[in-house]
Amino acid sequence: MEHKEPWRATLLTIFPEMFPGPLGLSLAGRALEEGKWALDAVDIRGFASGKHRSVDDSPFGGGAGMVMRPDVLDAAIHGTPAPGPLVYMTPRGRLLNQDLVRELAAGPGVRVLCGRFEGVDQRLLEAHGALEVSAGDFVLSGGEPAALVMLDAIVRLLPGVIGKEESLAEESFEWGSLEYPHYTRPQVWDGRTVPEVLLSGHHEKIRAWRKRQAEDITRQRRPDLWDRYVAAKNLSEG
């Protein structure tokens, strides 16, 4: 029987010691130990030349900060063969959402370029057809924290990582809406009680309540998601 290689994340970074970081713990960590996915953190400086192994230089046209050199990054990419698309973490990229996470999880893996300083020479991104991805509308000190967020979201979707598939199916974004509220023991806490319907044992009523809650939360907090959810619902209902 042909052995299937695990889904692989290859990180190109000047701080390889940041990985696996939190990905070495909990669900992702156990899955990593069990070989359900693999991770390689590659030090970009290992592909730089000169005494100081510099990976950056001043920008043409002037301006603040430094830019990561295309020749050094190109050597790192070619020197580290790995499956999957080259992903560059940047605030100007395609917004990371559950659709993109599913798309990346369905492939053989990803190569993630973690930028630093003012960013990466544009020619490098064009030469390699990099997929630019943003973790959100904010700026970080580098691409590593954003890469950790993206990889955690991906690993959760890999086969065998989460025991109950229904846990995935009921999470935020899986059906286009945010998730409903959760409750556990004690039944009364700080004068607040669990909604009666959840104690009823009536599964259909519980499902209907959870659906209403999810829809209300989505409509109130994320009108952009709500509009898409309603459009998709109307389309499915014909």
Swiss-Prot record:
E.C. number(s) listed in UniProt: 2.1.1.228
Xref: InterPro entries: Alpha/beta_knot_MTases, tRNA_m1G_MeTrfase_C_sf, tRNA_m1G_MeTrfase_TrmD, tRNA_m1G_MTases_N, tRNA_MeTrfase_TRMD/TRM10
Keywords: Cytoplasm, Methyltransferase, S-adenosyl-L-methionine, Transferase, tRNA processing
Main localization, broad class: cytoplasm
UniProt name for this protein: tRNA (guanine-N(1)-)-methyltransferase
Catalytic class of the enzyme: transferase
Family as reported in the entry's similarity comment: Belongs to the RNA methyltransferase TrmD family.
GO BP: tRNA N1-guanine methylation
Lineage: superkingdom: Bacteria
GO cellular component terms attached to this protein's record: cytosol
Keyword S-adenosyl-L-methionine tagged: yes
Gene Ontology MF, one: tRNA (guanine(37)-N1)-methyltransferase activity
Catalytic activity field: guanosine(37) in tRNA + S-adenosyl-L-methionine = N(1)-methylguanosine(37) in tRNA + S-adenosyl-L-homocysteine + H(+)
Pfam family, one: tRNA_m1G_MT
Function text: Specifically methylates guanosine-37 in various tRNAs.
Source organism (scientific name): Paramagnetospirillum magneticum (strain ATCC 700264 / AMB-1)
Positions bound to S-adenosyl-L-methionine: 115
Subunit structure as annotated in this protein's UniProt entry: Homodimer.
Subcellular location, record wording: Cytoplasm
HAMAP family: TrmD
NCBIfam families in the record: PRK00026.1, trmD
